[in-house]
From Swiss-Prot:
Family, per entry: Belongs to the bacterial ribosomal protein bTHX family.
Keyword Heme: no
Protein name: Small ribosomal subunit protein bTHXm
Self-association and partners: Component of the mitochondrial ribosome small subunit.
Signal peptide: none
InterPro entries according to UniProt: Ribosomal_bTHX/bTHXc/bTHXm, Ribosomal_bTHXc/bTHXc_plant
Length: 98
């Protein structure tokens, strides 16, 4: 658990230094109202978590379904396809088939 917290803190620290250095470079080259300056900061904000629509947590937050958060019935069908069983086989699978 401590390792995960340490890695998260390191990642945040790295991202903050990159964001500040990008902002300094951008403000030195362009005016502060330029949309070219705002674009890198916006893209770095959606890394992971609730705001990321590609993760399971993000899909729960948005209320949508997809490959990373599939519905139960679709998951069962994918398992049956892996086992090469007809989809009409009842779930849970009989013990002899497992």
């Amino acid at each position: 658990m401590a390792a995960m917290q340490w890695c998260g803190a390191m990642t945040r620290r790295i991202m903050m230094t990159q964001r500040t250095s990008a902002a300094l470079n951008c403000s030195a080259r362009y005016s502060s109202l330029s949309p070219a300056c705002a674009a890198p900061a916006v893209s770095e904000m959606d890394l992971c978590g609730r705001g990321d629509k590609k993760t399971k947590k993000g899909k729960r937050f948005k209320g949508s379904y997809g490959n990373s958060r599939g519905k139960k019935q679709k998951m069962i069908e994918r398992i049956k396809d892996k086992l090469e069983l007809p989809r009409s086989t009842p779930w849970p699978l009989p013990f002899k088939l497992i």
